[in-house]
Amino acid sequence: MILADIPVKRPHAMSFTTLEVVNFAFVRVETGDGLVGWGEAACLGGPTWSEESAESVQVVIERYIAPWLVGRDASGIERLRREMARRVQGNPFARAAVEMALWDLAGRALGVPVHRLLGGRVRDSVPLSWSLAVAAPEAELEEAREKVRLGHRIFKVKTGAHPLAHDIERVRRIRETVGAGVALRVDANQGWDRPTALAAIRALEPYALDFVEQPLPKWDLDGMAELARRVSVPIMADESCGSPQDALAIARLGGVSILALKVTKAAGILGTMAVARIAEAAGLGCYVGCMIETSLGTAAYLQVALAAAPVTWGCELFGPLLLKGDVVRRPVSYADGAILALDGPGLGVDIDETALNECARR
């Protein structure tokens, strides 16, 4: 286990925190014949987005997972996933980091990318959404202009940290700046109550939003479903959808039409693919979110984005573009407003241990 902290290139303002540094827990798993796999859990400034932090991930893995994992068959990922779930309640980020390393091992042992083990990729690249979360209005507009010049055609505006009128004006000015040909989304990160969410979305309807993400607290599934039926903009569940069971509950209630996939909140790649399968069966679309991972964690999320058919809303795998540092020898690649497929063995990236040690905690 290695804990590390990597600053972002500019503060990232969200409804629940303003992020200046991302905290990481990196997991290294080695087999008896010397094969090594890596996993990552990225935490947004401690236990802010979820109950977990890099420190809690380390404790759970070192004390409750690693002791029984040693000596087990690393290729039996499903069996190990189920045993982790039995031995460790909750703590999906910790479990995901370990499972991620096991997938990396499995792909490397067979000489194939993880997406081949998930059924093969159904796309060669995934459209990339850039999140606008800049406190200073003019700086935010300039960032949007620069990203458009670089080929970005999808933006997500982080709301809920400001008064509603301020956020509505932000969206209006961003739409005016990027033009009608660029896709625009909004993410409240649970920042609104029911009346505020209804007022906000109706006020934002003139700006042609693709969707509004997680407008209400994660526990308010009834409110999410009711809200979705009262507005014309599609509603996406993120924090509300952390497991296959959550996905099933959301699908049964109806209304919400998009599910956000995240490997760490679903306790691993297998759990994430299960959420995607439920979405597909229920006729829902999917979007691959992020926790601002390095290229290592981004590569794991990308395997899902490439292999899961219902990922029709793109992704926000921009972590390596926002972080000031990375931990791999060759970062993930972007072109024409998309993140490109990785076809190397395992997760498709190789750890640069020198770079990792430079950002590791002392």
Where are these regions (language model features)?
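N-terminal capping/lid subdomain adjacent to the active-site entrance of alpha/beta enzymes
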Residues: 1-185, 189-198, 202-206, 230, ...
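Flexible, glycine/charged-enriched surface loops at secondary-structure junctions
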Residues: 75-77, 113-117, 211-218, 290-291, ...
